[in-house]
Swiss-Prot record:
Record-level Gene Ontology MF annotations: molybdopterin synthase activity; nucleotide binding
Pathway membership: Cofactor biosynthesis; molybdopterin biosynthesis
Gene name of the encoded protein: Mocs2-1
Residue numbers bearing the Glycyl adenylate modification: G98
Protein name: Molybdopterin synthase sulfur carrier subunit
Complex and partners: Heterotetramer; composed of 2 small (MOCS2A) and 2 large (MOCS2B) subunits.
Length: 98
């Protein structure tokens, strides 16, 4: 094993989709979604990128969605998120109102 490399760890999270994201992917939730992390950590941007790889329909709204980790908004997607099996990741597009 090379020095300086963190071990890759796969965690399984539960995804929740709201509003437009739910319409695009055709479901409101998906359990046991695998995320490859670096020692249990992954940036919000990488989490969203992995979700968009699995659900390419979301690419159209990727730049406007917010993600939440265990009901806490991830305001800075460059920050690492500490992830564990069973955590909840919500994909929340902007809600239009009138």
């Amino acid at each position: 094993m090379s020095q300086g490399h963190r071990s890759e760890e796969v965690v399984r999270v539960n995804l929740l989709f709201f509003a437009k994201s739910r319409e695009l992917v055709g479901t409101s939730s998906l359990d046991n979604f695998p995320l490859a992390t670096s020692g249990g950590h992954l940036s919000g941007s990488a989490v969203l990128g992995t979700i968009c790889e699995r659900f390419p329909e979301l690419v159209a709204i990727r730049d406007s969605v917010i993600i939440a980790h265990n009901e806490q908004y991830c305001e800075d997607l460059t920050e690492p998120i500490s992830l564990a099996d069973g955590d909840e990741i919500a994909v929340i597009p902007p809600i239009a109102g009138g």
